[in-house]
Amino acid sequence: MQHLKRIGRLRCSAVMTIALLQLVLVITAQAEAPWPDPERFRAAIEAFESEDREAPPPSGAIVGTGSSSMRFWSVGDRFASDLSPLTVINRGFGGSVIHDVEIFLEPLVLKHQPRAVLIYEGDNDVAEGVPMQEILASYDRVQSRLDQLPSPPRVYWLAVKPSLARWSLWPQMQAVNDGLKERASRHPRITFVDVATPMLNEQGLPREDIFIADGLHMNAKGYDLWREALRPVLLPAELEFERAP
Protein backbone atom coordinates (compact mmCIF):
# COMPACT_ATOMS: atom_id res chain seq x y z
CA MET A 1 0.00 0.00 0.00
CA GLN A 2 2.77 2.42 0.94
CA HIS A 3 4.52 1.48 -2.30
CA LEU A 4 1.46 2.46 -4.34
CA LYS A 5 1.16 5.78 -2.49
CA ARG A 6 4.82 6.48 -3.18
CA ILE A 7 4.30 5.80 -6.90
CA GLY A 8 1.26 8.06 -6.87
CA ARG A 9 3.22 10.89 -5.27
CA LEU A 10 6.02 10.49 -7.81
CA ARG A 11 3.56 10.59 -10.69
CA CYS A 12 1.88 13.67 -9.26
CA SER A 13 5.26 15.35 -8.81
CA ALA A 14 6.24 14.50 -12.39
CA VAL A 15 2.97 15.90 -13.74
CA MET A 16 3.43 19.13 -11.76
CA THR A 17 7.02 19.46 -12.98
CA ILE A 18 5.96 19.03 -16.61
CA ALA A 19 3.12 21.54 -16.13
CA LEU A 20 5.54 24.04 -14.59
CA LEU A 21 7.99 23.62 -17.46
CA GLN A 22 5.19 24.13 -19.97
CA LEU A 23 4.12 27.29 -18.15
CA VAL A 24 7.69 28.62 -18.23
CA LEU A 25 7.90 27.92 -21.96
CA VAL A 26 4.61 29.71 -22.60
CA ILE A 27 5.65 32.75 -20.56
CA THR A 28 9.03 32.86 -22.31
CA ALA A 29 7.40 32.61 -25.73
CA GLN A 30 5.00 35.43 -24.86
CA ALA A 31 7.83 37.61 -23.58
CA GLU A 32 9.81 37.28 -26.79
CA ALA A 33 8.34 39.04 -29.82
CA PRO A 34 8.93 37.27 -33.13
CA TRP A 35 11.42 39.88 -34.30
CA PRO A 36 13.95 39.06 -37.02
CA ASP A 37 17.56 38.87 -35.84
CA PRO A 38 19.00 42.43 -35.76
CA GLU A 39 22.48 41.06 -36.46
CA ARG A 40 21.51 40.71 -40.13
CA PHE A 41 22.15 44.47 -40.32
CA ARG A 42 25.54 44.48 -38.62
CA ALA A 43 27.36 45.07 -41.93
CA ALA A 44 25.00 47.91 -42.88
CA ILE A 45 25.52 49.61 -39.52
CA GLU A 46 29.29 49.25 -39.83
CA ALA A 47 29.07 50.81 -43.30
CA PHE A 48 27.26 53.81 -41.80
CA GLU A 49 29.93 54.11 -39.12
CA SER A 50 32.68 53.99 -41.75
CA GLU A 51 30.87 56.67 -43.74
CA ASP A 52 30.61 58.83 -40.62
CA ARG A 53 34.35 58.54 -40.01
CA GLU A 54 35.24 59.49 -43.57
CA ALA A 55 32.81 62.40 -43.79
CA PRO A 56 31.46 63.29 -40.34
CA PRO A 57 27.91 64.65 -40.66
CA PRO A 58 26.97 67.75 -38.69
CA SER A 59 25.52 67.44 -35.22
CA GLY A 60 22.16 69.02 -34.55
CA ALA A 61 20.72 67.92 -37.88
CA ILE A 62 17.49 66.02 -38.58
CA VAL A 63 18.07 62.27 -38.80
CA GLY A 64 15.74 60.08 -40.83
CA THR A 65 15.80 56.36 -40.15
CA GLY A 66 13.67 53.34 -40.93
CA SER A 67 13.14 50.75 -43.62
CA SER A 68 13.59 50.83 -47.39
CA SER A 69 11.00 53.57 -47.97
CA MET A 70 13.29 55.84 -45.97
CA ARG A 71 16.49 54.46 -47.50
CA PHE A 72 15.35 54.81 -51.13
CA TRP A 73 14.35 58.40 -50.44
CA SER A 74 18.04 59.25 -50.41
CA VAL A 75 18.63 57.98 -53.96
CA GLY A 76 19.97 60.85 -56.06
CA ASP A 77 20.19 62.96 -52.91
CA ARG A 78 16.44 63.44 -53.11
CA PHE A 79 15.90 63.26 -49.35
CA ALA A 80 18.06 66.35 -48.88
CA SER A 81 16.53 68.27 -51.78
CA ASP A 82 12.94 67.45 -50.80
CA LEU A 83 13.50 68.77 -47.28
CA SER A 84 15.80 71.66 -48.20
CA PRO A 85 16.89 74.00 -46.67
CA LEU A 86 16.85 71.78 -43.58
CA THR A 87 20.02 69.86 -42.75
CA VAL A 88 19.18 66.17 -42.88
CA ILE A 89 20.95 62.83 -42.50
CA ASN A 90 19.41 59.69 -44.00
CA ARG A 91 20.06 56.51 -42.05
CA GLY A 92 17.44 54.27 -43.62
CA PHE A 93 18.27 50.57 -43.94
CA GLY A 94 16.08 48.38 -46.13
CA GLY A 95 14.18 45.46 -44.65
CA SER A 96 14.34 46.80 -41.11
CA VAL A 97 11.69 46.81 -38.40
CA ILE A 98 11.30 49.16 -35.45
CA HIS A 99 13.11 46.66 -33.20
CA ASP A 100 16.20 47.07 -35.39
CA VAL A 101 16.05 50.84 -34.86
CA GLU A 102 15.75 50.17 -31.14
CA ILE A 103 18.82 47.91 -31.11
CA PHE A 104 20.97 50.18 -33.27
CA LEU A 105 19.65 53.53 -32.04
CA GLU A 106 23.08 54.71 -30.88
CA PRO A 107 24.98 54.41 -34.20
CA LEU A 108 21.95 55.31 -36.31
CA VAL A 109 20.62 58.29 -34.40
CA LEU A 110 22.01 59.17 -30.98
CA LYS A 111 25.62 59.68 -32.05
CA HIS A 112 24.51 62.50 -34.34
CA GLN A 113 22.96 64.50 -31.48
CA PRO A 114 19.93 65.29 -33.65
CA ARG A 115 17.54 68.10 -32.99
CA ALA A 116 14.79 66.06 -34.67
CA VAL A 117 14.24 62.47 -35.78
CA LEU A 118 12.06 61.05 -38.56
CA ILE A 119 11.08 57.38 -38.22
CA TYR A 120 9.43 55.17 -40.81
CA GLU A 121 8.80 51.62 -39.62
CA GLY A 122 5.86 49.26 -39.17
CA ASP A 123 5.64 48.13 -42.79
CA ASN A 124 7.95 45.14 -42.53
CA ASP A 125 6.94 44.59 -38.92
CA VAL A 126 3.36 43.78 -39.89
CA ALA A 127 4.54 41.71 -42.86
CA GLU A 128 6.72 39.68 -40.48
CA GLY A 129 3.69 38.90 -38.34
CA VAL A 130 4.80 40.93 -35.32
CA PRO A 131 1.74 41.73 -33.15
CA MET A 132 0.61 45.34 -33.09
CA GLN A 133 1.24 45.73 -29.36
CA GLU A 134 4.83 44.53 -29.76
CA ILE A 135 5.40 47.04 -32.57
CA LEU A 136 4.01 49.88 -30.49
CA ALA A 137 5.96 48.76 -27.42
CA SER A 138 9.21 48.94 -29.40
CA TYR A 139 8.28 52.45 -30.59
CA ASP A 140 7.70 53.34 -26.94
CA ARG A 141 11.13 52.06 -25.93
CA VAL A 142 12.81 54.02 -28.72
CA GLN A 143 10.97 57.14 -27.63
CA SER A 144 11.88 56.58 -23.99
CA ARG A 145 15.57 56.60 -24.87
CA LEU A 146 15.18 59.75 -26.94
CA ASP A 147 13.32 61.42 -24.07
CA GLN A 148 16.23 60.69 -21.73
CA LEU A 149 18.74 62.65 -23.80
CA PRO A 150 20.05 65.93 -22.33
CA SER A 151 18.35 67.77 -25.20
CA PRO A 152 15.48 65.51 -26.28
CA PRO A 153 14.79 65.82 -30.01
CA ARG A 154 11.46 66.44 -31.64
CA VAL A 155 10.24 63.23 -33.24
CA TYR A 156 8.15 62.70 -36.37
CA TRP A 157 6.50 59.33 -36.86
CA LEU A 158 5.60 58.69 -40.48
CA ALA A 159 2.45 56.61 -40.94
CA VAL A 160 2.80 53.06 -42.21
CA LYS A 161 2.08 53.32 -45.92
CA PRO A 162 -0.44 51.31 -47.95
CA SER A 163 0.89 49.40 -50.95
CA LEU A 164 -0.32 47.16 -53.74
CA ALA A 165 1.88 44.28 -52.64
CA ARG A 166 0.73 44.33 -49.00
CA TRP A 167 -2.83 45.54 -49.36
CA SER A 168 -4.17 42.45 -47.55
CA LEU A 169 -2.27 43.65 -44.47
CA TRP A 170 -3.68 47.17 -44.55
CA PRO A 171 -6.15 46.64 -41.65
CA GLN A 172 -3.26 45.65 -39.37
CA MET A 173 -1.19 48.58 -40.62
CA GLN A 174 -4.08 50.95 -39.95
CA ALA A 175 -4.25 49.62 -36.39
CA VAL A 176 -0.55 50.41 -35.94
CA ASN A 177 -1.13 53.90 -37.36
CA ASP A 178 -4.02 54.46 -34.96
CA GLY A 179 -1.78 53.44 -32.07
CA LEU A 180 1.02 55.74 -33.18
CA LYS A 181 -1.36 58.65 -33.72
CA GLU A 182 -2.89 58.21 -30.28
CA ARG A 183 0.53 58.10 -28.63
CA ALA A 184 1.69 61.18 -30.51
CA SER A 185 -1.39 63.09 -29.35
CA ARG A 186 -0.27 62.58 -25.74
CA HIS A 187 3.39 63.47 -26.18
CA PRO A 188 4.57 67.09 -26.56
CA ARG A 189 7.54 66.26 -28.80
CA ILE A 190 6.02 63.63 -31.12
CA THR A 191 4.21 64.51 -34.34
CA PHE A 192 2.38 61.86 -36.35
CA VAL A 193 2.66 62.61 -40.07
CA ASP A 194 -0.02 61.04 -42.25
CA VAL A 195 1.85 60.12 -45.42
CA ALA A 196 -0.57 57.23 -46.00
CA THR A 197 -3.88 58.91 -46.88
CA PRO A 198 -2.50 60.76 -49.95
CA MET A 199 -1.39 57.37 -51.31
CA LEU A 200 -5.01 56.17 -51.58
CA ASN A 201 -7.34 56.92 -54.49
CA GLU A 202 -10.97 58.05 -54.31
CA GLN A 203 -12.08 54.45 -53.78
CA GLY A 204 -9.77 54.11 -50.80
CA LEU A 205 -7.37 51.80 -52.64
CA PRO A 206 -3.62 52.26 -53.20
CA ARG A 207 -2.85 54.43 -56.20
CA GLU A 208 -1.29 52.30 -58.91
CA ASP A 209 0.85 55.08 -60.38
CA ILE A 210 3.07 55.66 -57.34
CA PHE A 211 4.86 52.31 -57.07
CA ILE A 212 7.65 50.59 -58.95
CA ALA A 213 7.08 47.16 -60.49
CA ASP A 214 7.18 45.28 -57.17
CA GLY A 215 4.07 47.12 -55.97
CA LEU A 216 5.75 47.81 -52.64
CA HIS A 217 8.38 50.49 -53.07
CA MET A 218 7.57 53.98 -54.29
CA ASN A 219 8.55 55.69 -57.51
CA ALA A 220 9.18 59.43 -57.89
CA LYS A 221 5.44 60.20 -57.78
CA GLY A 222 5.17 58.38 -54.48
CA TYR A 223 7.96 60.42 -52.97
CA ASP A 224 6.33 63.57 -54.34
CA LEU A 225 3.35 62.73 -52.12
CA TRP A 226 5.59 62.18 -49.10
CA ARG A 227 7.37 65.48 -49.72
CA GLU A 228 4.08 67.36 -49.95
CA ALA A 229 2.81 65.70 -46.77
CA LEU A 230 5.97 66.27 -44.74
CA ARG A 231 7.24 69.71 -45.75
CA PRO A 232 4.22 71.64 -44.38
CA VAL A 233 4.73 69.89 -41.05
CA LEU A 234 8.51 69.88 -40.84
CA LEU A 235 9.54 73.29 -42.15
CA PRO A 236 7.42 75.47 -39.83
CA ALA A 237 8.62 73.44 -36.84
CA GLU A 238 12.29 73.08 -37.75
CA LEU A 239 13.38 76.00 -39.90
CA GLU A 240 13.93 78.32 -36.95
CA PHE A 241 16.47 75.87 -35.54
CA GLU A 242 18.48 75.67 -38.73
CA ARG A 243 22.01 76.92 -38.23
CA ALA A 244 23.26 79.76 -40.35
CA PRO A 245 25.97 78.71 -42.86
Name what the model sees in each region.
Residues M1-L10:
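N-terminal secretory signal peptides that target proteins for export/translocation
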Residues Q30-Q113:
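Serine-esterase "nucleophile elbow" of acetyl-processing enzymes
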Residues S81-L83, I103-A244:
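Alpha-helical cap/lid subdomain in secreted, periplasmic
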Residues S13-V26:
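Bacterial N-terminal signal peptides
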Residues V15, S59-G60, I212:
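A generic hydrophobic-helix recognition signal that picks specific residues
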